[in-house]
Structures are given as C-alpha cells and as structure tokens.
Design a protein with these regions (language model features):
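One-carbon transfer enzymes
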Residues: 1-194
C-alpha cells in the first residue's frame, strides 16, 4: 500500500524510510524550510508543502487529505511531524496512521519526553511506534525498543541513542503497515515481529 509521510523538520526518520526502500508516494511538510523536503527530492519522491500557519485545524487537515488523496495514499507515517492531528484527519486512516514517540509509552507522552525521562531518573527509556488515535500519544502500541539511561546523560546524548533505535524500528513497522500485516484488536496489535 502507498505510504504518505508527514514531516516538519530535519527528516532523519524520513531518510531511514527512504533507505529501507518503502513505497512512499508523497512527503508533505508543514514548514517550507523543512530539510526533509530536500531528502525527498534527492530520492525522487513527490513532495509538497502544506503550511498550517493562518489556517484553522480542519482547513489545514483538509489540505493534507487532498494531497494524500491525489497521490493515492492508503497509509500515513508521521516522521517528526510536529502537529497534533484531530479526529477529522485521524478517522480517514483507521489503523493506517502511525507515529513514533521518544519514550516507552505510556510513560512521558507529549512534548519533551526525553527531558521528562531524565527529570524522573528512569534507568531505561526508548522509542515507541504506535497507531494514532484521538488521544495524544495514546494509540495502540505496535513496537518498542529500550535504551539505557547512562550516568551523565543529557538530553542530546539520550535522544541520540533513542534516535538510533527509532531509525531501526520505524522502517520495520512501516513495512508491516504497507504490506497489510498489522491488525489491531482493541489495544493489542498483531502482525509485527522484528
């Protein structure tokens, strides 16, 4: 199934998806300065900017949906997309919309998860890939990878270790999504094995 990838910034997760050879039909950035657009262009992938500034949420999401429909996208990967999507968008892709989060959910949802982990003194952190639902980082968990929190870690060091696992895990989950292997029964996701 064709994937659409939504991005906001650097695009390192997008690059991991590109390097994995996934069927990406279009990359959409909500910021024209997003470096991810150059990564898409270099890979020969269609890419567009749909800015959110000055638009109501539903109007912005309608523009996203129009671009995704034009490219026949069947599933969506949020790869560093820094906007919260409403039910209006989410309901178009039931169990076909995934996100990554830099914590072992349900711990530390929302912004600054890495800083929250350090502030709480946890010994393990990590990355979660989950289905997006109507809650903030609360959708059914597809896969997780843990990393140790080392003495002396700061946000940068811990986030770099998490990011390495994210770049490994996200393409594997996205491939399972694209091939239709994932199934969700309540909060239990089946069909993914590393």
């Amino acid at each position: 199934m064709n994937l659409g990838v939504l991005v906001s910034g650097e695009g390192s997760n997008l690059q991991a998806l590109i390097d994995a050879g996934l069927p990406i039909a279009v990359v959409i950035a909500n910021k024209p300065e997003a470096r991810a657009l150059a990564r898409a262009a270099q890979a020969g992938i269609a890419h567009e900017v749909v800015e959110h500034k000055g638009l109501e949420r539903v109007a912005f999401e309608d523009r996203l949906l129009a671009v995704l429909a034009a490219h026949r996208v069947e599933a969506v990967v949020l790869a560093g997309f820094m906007r919260v999507l409403t039910a209006h968008f989410v309901d178009h892709f039931p169990q076909r919309l995934i996100n990554t989060h830099p914590s072992l959910l349900p711990a530390f949802p929302g912004a600054d998860a890495v800083a929250q982990a350090l502030a709480h003194g946890v010994k393990l952190s990590g990355v979660t890939v989950h289905f997006v639902d109507h809650s903030l980082d609360g959708g059914p968990i597809i896969a997780q990878a843990a990393v140790p929190v080392l003495p002396g870690d700061d946000r940068h060091a811990l986030h770099a270790r998490i990011r390495r696992e994210e770049h490994r895990l996200l393409p594997a989950v996205a491939r399972a999504l694209a091939t239709g292997e994932l199934a969700c029964e309540g909060r239990i996701v089946r069909g993914f094995a590393e």
